[in-house]
C-alpha cells in the first residue's frame, strides 16, 4: 500500500458530557477531568498534526464545550491552517460563546439531536435538552458557519424518518447526517431495543433516496446504514491507521475511538511523544495497516482494498478475534453471530424493555 497520510485529527478533548444517551459511543471506561491533557499539550498536538499534512481538525468529546479552552484550541487549529469542526450537543453554548468560537476561527459546527419530538429526544438523552438545542440551532444560522445536523436513528424512531428530515429542513441545516446506531460502547448494552428490523432498513433507504432527489442543491443528506444489515462491512475509519488519528482526553493516540478494547495493543500517548513518531512508528498503528495481517477470506478477497477487512473492534466483540473478518460481512464464517443478534433483537418487545442509561438520569435529578 502507499504511505499512510494523516488527513484528519479527531481530538476527543474531554469525556465530560451533560447527556446520558442510551447509545453513547464513548468507551465504557472514561477519563476524568484530572487526566485530561492541558491546553498547551493540545496546541502542540494540533501544530504537529498540521506539519504531518493533516487537513481537518474535529473537536469532540464528550461535550467539547465542557472545557474552557475550546476557543484557544480552535484558534490553534486555524493558525495551523486546519479546517476546524466542532461536534457538540449544544449544551453549554450561549450566543456570547458562539460568537467567541466564530471569532476564534471555527469553520463548521455539527449539532446533535436525539429526535425531532421533544419527549422522545429527552427520553433517549436522559435529560431535558431538546428545547435548548432548538435555540442553539437558531443561533448557529445567524453566523456564516457550515452547519451539519446529526440525527441518530434506531428501531424506535426510524419509522418517522420523513418527519426527521423535515425537522432538519426547518432548522436550515446545510447537511443532514442520519446515522444508525453503531453498536460499540454503551450502545451494545441497548442493542436489542435499538436495532431496527430489515423491513425498517429497506423502507428507510427508499425515503432517503427520495429526499436526496427532492433536496438536491438545498441540503445534503448522508445516511449511515446499520452494519448488521450490510452485505459487506464498512471501511471502518477509512482503514486502520490509513488517514485518521483519534486522541482521547488523556492523550492516548488510537486509529479509532473503540480501539482500546483490543487486548495486546499498547497505544502511545501524544502528550508525551510526537505525532510523527506515533503515526509512522507506533506498533499499534502498524498492527492492522496494510494487508499482511489479513486472514482468509479477506487475504484473497477483491474487496480487501475497499473495506480493509471491516472493523477490528466489531470482529473482537462479535467473533472474539480482532484479526477475524468483520462478522457483518456476508463472506465471514462468523456471520452467524450477527444473524443471532438480529433474531434476538427482533424478538424483543421494545415497548416493555427499559433503557440502560450511561448514567442514571433519575439519580442525578436532571
Predicted regions and their residues:
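Conserved alpha-helical substructure of the radical SAM core
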Residues: 1-108
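Short Fe-S-cluster ligation motifs
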Residues: 45-61, 326-366
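Radical SAM enzyme [4Fe-4S]-AdoMet core and its adjacent flexible, acidic
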Residues: 83, 99, 103-108, 112-254, ...
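Flexible loop residues that form catalytic
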Residues: 29, 62, 114, 181, ...
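Short beta->alpha junction loops/turns
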Residues: 14, 63, 90-91, 114, ...
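Structural motif corresponding to alpha-helix initiation and N-cap regions
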Residues: 39-43, 67, 94-95, 118, ...
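Conserved phosphate-coordination/catalytic loops
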Residues: 36-40, 127-131, 292
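Accessory C-terminal segments flanking Radical SAM cores
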Residues: 223-337
Amino acid at each position: 500500500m502507499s504511505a499512510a497520510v494523516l488527513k484528519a485529527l479527531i481530538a476527543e478533548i474531554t469525556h465530560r458530557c451533560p447527556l446520558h444517551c442510551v447509545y453513547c459511543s464513548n468507551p465504557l471506561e472514561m477519563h476524568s477531568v484530572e487526566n485530561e491533557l492541558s491546553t498547551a499539550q493540545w496546541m502542540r498536538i494540533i501544530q504537529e498534526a498540521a506539519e504531518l499534512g493533516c487537513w481537518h481538525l474535529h473537536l469532540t468529546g464528550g461535550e467539547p464545550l465542557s472545557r474552557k479552552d475550546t476557543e484557544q484550541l480552535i484558534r490553534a487549529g486555524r493558525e495551523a491552517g486546519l479546517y476546524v469542526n466542532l461536534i457538540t450537543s449544544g449544551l453549554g453554548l450561549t450566543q456570547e460563546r458562539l460568537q467567541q468560537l466564530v471569532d476564534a476561527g471555527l469553520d463548521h459546527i455539527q449539532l446533535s439531536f436525539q429526535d425531532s419530538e421533544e419527549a422522545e429526544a429527552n427520553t433517549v438523552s436522559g435529560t431535558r435538552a431538546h428545547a435548548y438545542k432548538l435555540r442553539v440551532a437558531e443561533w448557529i444560522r445567524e453566523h456564516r458557519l457550515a452547519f451539519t445536523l446529526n440525527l441518530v436513528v434506531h428501531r424506535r424512531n426510524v419509522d418517522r424518518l420523513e418527519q426527521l428530515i423535515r425537522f432538519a429542513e426547518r432548522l436550515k441545516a446545510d447537511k443532514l447526517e442520519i446515522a444508525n446506531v453503531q453498536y460499540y460502547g454503551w450502545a451494545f448494552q441497548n442493542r436489542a431495543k435499538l436495532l431496527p428490523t430489515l423491513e425498517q432498513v429497506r423502507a428507510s433507504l427508499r425515503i432517503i433516496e427520495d429526499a436526496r432527489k427532492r433536496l438536491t442543491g438545498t441540503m445534503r443528506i448522508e445516511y449511515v446504514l446499520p452494519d448488521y444489515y450490510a452485505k459487506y462491512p464498512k471501511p471502518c475509519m477509512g482503514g486502520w491507521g490509513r488517514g485518521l488519528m483519534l486522541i482521547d482526553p488523556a492523550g492516548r493516540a488510537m486509529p479509532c475511538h473503540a480501539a482500546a478494547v483490543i487486548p495486546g495493543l499498547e497505544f502511545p500517548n501524544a502528550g508525551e511523544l510526537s505525532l510523527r513518531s506515533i503515526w509512522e512508528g507506533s506498533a499499534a498503528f502498524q498492527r492492522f495497516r496494510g494487508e499482511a495481517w489479513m486472514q482468509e477470506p479477506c487475504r484473497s478477497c477483491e474487496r480487501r482494498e475497499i473495506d480493509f477487512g471491516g472493523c477490528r473492534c466489531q470482529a473482537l466483540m462479535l467473533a472474539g478475534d480482532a484479526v477475524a473478518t468483520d462478522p457483518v460481512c456476508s463472506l465471514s464464517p462468523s456471520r452467524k453471530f450477527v444473524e443471532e443478534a438480529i433474531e434476538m433483537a427482533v424478538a424483543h418487545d421494545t415497548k416493555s424493555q427499559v433503557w440502560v442509561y450511561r448514567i442514571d438520569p433519575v439519580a442525578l435529578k436532571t
